[in-house]
Amino acid sequence: MARDSALNVSVGIIAAVMICVAASQASDVFAPFALALFIIALVWPLQSWLQARMPALLALAITMTVTVAVCIAFASLVAWAFGRVGVSLLADTARYQALYQRAIDWLEDRGISVAGLWSEHFNVGWLVHWAGQITGRVNTTLSFWLIALLYVILGLMEVDDLRRRAQAYLRPETARILLQGSAATAVKIRKYMEVRTLMSVATGVLVGLFAWVAGLHFALEWGVIAFALNYIPFIGPFVATLFPTLVAMTQFESWEAAVGVFVCLNIIQFVVGSYIEPRVSGAMLAMSPTVVLLAVFLWTYLWGLFGAFIGVPIVIAIVTFCAHHPSSRWIADLLGGPVEKNDLARA
């Protein structure tokens, strides 16, 4: 019995590693497909409501129009904010270099020699260039989104057919796990995005108000950036506090002011992310912070910036499906808690 358990664990680990390798090597195929499944989970209630009242193709056209319009509006807003901030950062490269040199001189006057070490591994010009690249870079190309939207169109057309096929051709227990797991996963993903959007709006408003009260340039842009990056756990909030700090360094020409801006922004992120959000999301989306952090970094490594965004929904899906089978329920209990009865009823 113990040998069988050890064998099952070993096979599971090997399978997980192989899946990660396949996801990385075939990211051009799997990443758009993952995005499509995510979008389908979000928009299916709209599609289902519309196609009950009009022809399915007309309902699909309306759903896709709304989806594309929301994506374009969000991308345009983010590009506007990052573009304005990025131009400012690149224009102040010389001032950042001067502040950096002043910091080195201050440390050396106190017997702390770091110039030789930092000059080999760190340069403010490189840092600003890197920051400027981030502000102007979109990790997902047009072809990526076109493929994903094609998957969405085909997927929305086949949801009902796939449900009937699963019930007709799969074993009853397998069909139950697949259908209930898919429905519960979709419910949780919609809840996740609802909570994440509310918290992103709250974070953006608070950051924008703080920047305006503090007299920091680009207050509206900082609010938009904080709103957008809050969709990426851990990494996004850190970047959203780093950029305003860089601008504060040149605007106020004071390390103390820059540190103050950095601390205040992190307090906002901490209060919203660690205190308010868990109470809004409740037990339905409860997951270990370690699991969330691992998911973010793992999928960032596999799929880049898009992986940082989609990592948590992937873990939500894995935990939810594991909760619907007795042999894997312990994984759900370990990573995210047992499935809630009201979640299944709502699905």
Give the residues covered by each predicted segment.
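Membrane-interface starts of transmembrane alpha-helices
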Residues: 54-63, 175-178, 236-239, 288, ...
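Membrane-water interface of transmembrane alpha-helices in multipass transporters/channels
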Residues: 27-35, 213-224, 252-260, 287-292, ...
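Juxtamembrane membrane-interface segments in integral membrane proteins
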Residues: 3, 46-54, 58-66, 73-147, ...
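Hydrophobic transmembrane alpha-helices
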Residues: 36-43, 152-155, 224-231, 235-238, ...
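Generic alpha-helical transmembrane segments of integral inner-membrane proteins
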Residues: 13-18, 22, 61-74, 142-149, ...
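Hydrophobic alpha-helical transmembrane segments of membrane transport and translocation systems
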Residues: 258-347
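Anchoring transmembrane alpha helix of integral membrane proteins
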Residues: 1-80, 259, 316, 320-347
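Alpha-helical transmembrane segments and their immediate interhelical loop/hinge regions
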Residues: 6-8, 137, 141-251, 255-263
